[in-house]
Amino acid sequence: MGTNGVRVFVILYLLAVCGCIEYDVDDNVHICTHTNVSHINHTSWYYNDKVIALATEDKTSGYISSFIKRVNISLTCLNISSLRYEDSGTYKGVSHLKDGVIVTTTMNISVKANIIDLTGRVRYLTRNYCEVKIRCEITSFALNGSTTPPHMILGTVDKWKYLPFPTDDYRYVGELKRYISGNPYPTESLALEISSTFNRFTIVKNLNDDEFSCYLFSQNYSFHKMLNVRNICESEWEALNNNNDNSSSMPASHNNLANDLSSMMSQLQNDNDDNNDYSAPMNVDNLIMIVLITMLSIILVIIVVIAAISMYKRSKYRHIDN
């Protein structure tokens, strides 16, 4: 091997950076070489041995489509923002120096696949009563060497739901060696929902009744997320009290005026509703009655007139006979 070949080998060995780092979804990652930028002629960046881009002193070209909006590439650095599950893999930058030396920088990135989204939404609220729907959704998970499908549990110690996950229905990403939610798996199949009710003045004897947990567990691993649902109700009750306090702090005249207006509007609404419900049939009935009465009146008048004429003629004839 020539001197230059040995030199390149030594530099590749000493300057190669290989780190296996785990990131969360939406994290930002920076992969940089420590070589002076003035010594670099051009750098080729790779993702799982596929070229991402070629960076030169003048420009950078060749971004792959999935990275266009989330990546910033230069001669010395590869910066990725808003990491996704599918971004996991091996990244490598091969810098060609102006003196012919090649410097390689490599980093293995693993984006956490086990993602639990646990939320609570108030469905019904009064001064003393609160009903919350708790929803747990698994957006992604990894088998981590397990040979059995994972299972999901949502609830408290005394109240829970159970769901086995058929991994065959998930979208499997071979490069990541993990299952990710998405086509063709229905979104609603990835979640469990449970409802719980709370009374504001009930004394809490067991805090576990307020803590809801969502577990995902398999053969050799498990992880979970917790949510205090009663705290959600407490926040809503406090907001309700604040609104009532603001209303009660208004001057009495304003309250009376508001009440009067409210009563008037309610009465008008009730009257309108009554009119809408009954005015049409009542008008038709009245019209029919009026027509019948009018006809009977006319007939009666005609009968009276005829009778009067007949009586007049009879009296006249009697007078002539006499």
Swiss-Prot record:
Induction notes from the record: Expressed in the early phase of the viral replicative cycle.
Residues spanning the signal sequence: 1-20
TM stretches of this protein: 287-307
One biological process term in Gene Ontology: viral process
A GO cellular component entry from the record: membrane
Keyword Hydrolase attached: no
Domain of life of the organism encoding this protein: Viruses
Localisation per UniProt entry: Host cell membrane
UniProt keyword list: Glycoprotein, Host cell membrane, Host membrane, Membrane, Signal, Transmembrane, Transmembrane helix
Entry keyword Cytoplasm: no
A Pfam match: Pox_I6
Membrane-related topology note: Single-pass membrane protein
Residues modified by glycosylation: 36, 41, 72, 79, 108, 144, 220, 246
Protein family per UniProt: Belongs to the orthopoxvirus OPG049 family.
Protein's job: Plays a role in the spread of virus to neighboring cells ex vivo.
Protein name as annotated: Protein OPG049
Source organism of this protein record: Vaccinia virus (strain Western Reserve) (VACV)
Recorded name of the encoding gene: OPG049
